[in-house]
């Protein structure tokens, strides 16, 4: 009998989940417990769900991860003792319930009952009483529980303490607005492939397909959708008419000042948005795109194929010159450097969970190595554009200031059309400015 019971329990745990709430709980639990990236595991989870459950699952995953420090602080008020590590999925299910009650326009009784039913789908029906009691307690006493739970910056702004302190230090006048912008659901920007049609022509097609949008002044190829949609609803997406890319990232191609007959290096290229934009600007140029991750390099290939473009793709660490360089110098080098991603938290809220304070120093060191290794590969009068999607000064203006003091043959090129706010070195856009992502740009000329 004991063996039979164990077999039944194993089957319950291993069966495929077909509803949004327990599916979201498993994804969130994996992010919290195993520090796995949200995008990858969510993509896999959605494939196993019926189409009518996918939207809610995605909304729960992003919402709970975005507000995790706040929701966790509330959950701590509801539980007499923490759940065990092996029950991270139950912890996540409770957070899903709280998120529905706090932020989603769902009937409360349905949100509560369906969340409680998720315990059985997770193979843990014994937890129904615990989840039910916790959520009902919150329903009854929300105001007093919130007052206790939200009495500190970590819970109020839903960011880890170390990151709040760093942003306060770097941006003492605007740190609160930055944190608030990080918690806003991001808009959806498009980049029109002008090798196929003009921006105005594509805008007309969007409107004809009941997808209202508007031009973005900061980039000549950029459109902003009124409401985000599935990419496969975009006219001729599969045949390369358009790509999804934040307008802040779209400004990079203009800063490179691309001309015909140039040899261009995109040193940290995946997933390929900037590589493709460079080629759309001048398809005949020789573009070498590197990435250390072969799976991510495959993403670049998929994007260039969809857009009908060609780049030379190499799996390599850009800093390991001997492993990939053929000895010919470049006219343009783009270092879209690995960084904390602190400027794009609104798009990747799991950054709050996955990043650690120690990451900053290691990333700054890697950025410095890339600058030092790749700079000698640039032709005289060539341009090196250094970008990050970070807002931390160590990774941005301080990094470039340090580089310029060490290299007399390097000068910063002041841009006639500033892509963002001028800093001591480079240009910084903070998250949410003009509804764009946080981004840093510096353009260096080899004298």
Language-model segment annotations:
Residues 2-447:
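S-adenosylmethionine
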């Amino acid at each position: 009998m004991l063996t039979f019971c164990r077999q039944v329990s194993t089957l319950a745990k291993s069966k495929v989940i077909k509803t949004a709430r327990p599916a979201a709980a498993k994804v969130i639990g994996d992010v919290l417990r195993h520090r796995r990236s949200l995008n990858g595991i969510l993509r896999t989870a959605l494939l196993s769900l019926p189409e009518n459950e996918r939207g809610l699952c995605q909304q729960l995953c992003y919402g709970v991860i975005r507000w995790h420090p706040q929701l966790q602080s509330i959950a701590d008020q509801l539980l007499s003792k923490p759940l065990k590590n092996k029950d991270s999925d139950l912890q996540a299910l409770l957070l899903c319930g709280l998120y529905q009650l706090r932020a989603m326009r769902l009937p409360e009784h349905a949100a509560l009952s369906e969340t409680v039913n998720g315990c059985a789908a997770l193979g843990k029906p014994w937890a129904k009483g615990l989840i039910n009691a916790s959520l009902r307690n919150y329903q009854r006493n929300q105001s007093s529980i919130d007052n206790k739970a939200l009495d500190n910056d970590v819970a109020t702004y839903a960011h880890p303490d170390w990151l709040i302190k760093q942003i306060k230090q770097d941006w003492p006048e605007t740190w609160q607005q930055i944190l608030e912008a990080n918690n806003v659901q991001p808009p959806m920007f498009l980049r029109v492939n002008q090798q196929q049609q003009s921006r105005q022509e594509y805008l007309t097609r969007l409107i004809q397909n009941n997808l209202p949008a508007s031009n973005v002044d900061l980039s000549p190829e950029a459109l902003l959708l009124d409401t985000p949609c599935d990419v496969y609803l975009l006219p001729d997406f599969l045949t390369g008419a358009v790509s999804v890319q934040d307008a802040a990232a779209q400004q990079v191609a203009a800063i490179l000042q691309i001309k015909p007959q140039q040899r261009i290096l995109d040193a940290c290229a995946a997933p390929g948005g900037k590589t493709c934009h460079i080629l759309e600007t001048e398809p005949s140029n020789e573009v070498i795109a590197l990435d250390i991750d072969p799976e991510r390099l495959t993403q670049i290939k998929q994007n260039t194929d969809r857009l009908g473009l060609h780049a030379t793709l190499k799996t390599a660490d850009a800093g390991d010159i001997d492993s990939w360089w053929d000895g010919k110098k470049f006219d343009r080098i783009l270092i879209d450097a690995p960084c904390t991603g602190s400027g794009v938290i609104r798009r990747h809220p799991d950054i709050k969970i996955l990043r650690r304070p120690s990451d900053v120093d290691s990333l700054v060191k890697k950025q410095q190595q890339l600058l030092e290794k790749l700079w000698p590969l640039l032709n005289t009068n060539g341009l090196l554009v250094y970008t990050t999607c970070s807002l931390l000064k160590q990774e941005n203006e301080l990094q470039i200031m340090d580089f310029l003091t060490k290299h007399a043959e390097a000068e910063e090129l002041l841009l006639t059309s500033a892509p963002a706010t001028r800093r001591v070195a480079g240009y910084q856009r903070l998250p949410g400015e003009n509804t764009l992502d946080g981004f840093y740009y510096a353009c260096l000329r080899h004298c």
